Amino acid sequence: MLIEVERQDDVCVLRLQGRLVTGADPAYLLAKTDEIKSQNCDKVLADLRELLSIGSTGIGFLVGIYTSVTKSPGRRFVLVGPRRRVREVLDLTHLSSVIPVVSDIASGLAALRAEGPAAQSAGEGSSVL
């Protein structure tokens, strides 16, 4: 499991790679959560294209970041490009009906940069996968 955090202009990009499942190092996940929070980003894009599998630990990590990011008005979080197996877990847990899921980076950036409160809900639960 590898989680990279980088800032690209007004967006924090999280790149998740490998397997985010039970047994993942809790200290590592806490450190990454703190790193993301310290960036104080209003817009966060989680790139899941290289995430091979996700379990309850990974779902908990994503929910924690989502909750932290979106607790203030106007802040947005989007998931990008989950593989079929990861998408199935997002659907099974209904996380994909809460957090917008899009197929590619360009769509994710467009969703994050759209104006107004309707912009976030426009992608919620929808998918172009």
Predicted regions, residues:
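Short beta-strand/loop segment at the start of cytosolic alpha/beta domains
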Residues: 1-15, 128
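General small-molecule cofactor/ligand-binding pocket signal
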Residues: 6, 80, 102
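Conserved catalytic submotifs in the C-terminal HATPase_c
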Residues: 8, 49, 106
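Active-site donor-binding loop signature of nucleotide-sugar glycosyltransferases
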Residues: 16-18, 104
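Amphipathic alpha-helical interaction surfaces in cytosolic regulatory modules
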Residues: 20-99
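A charged, well-structured terminal subsegment
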Residues: 100-129
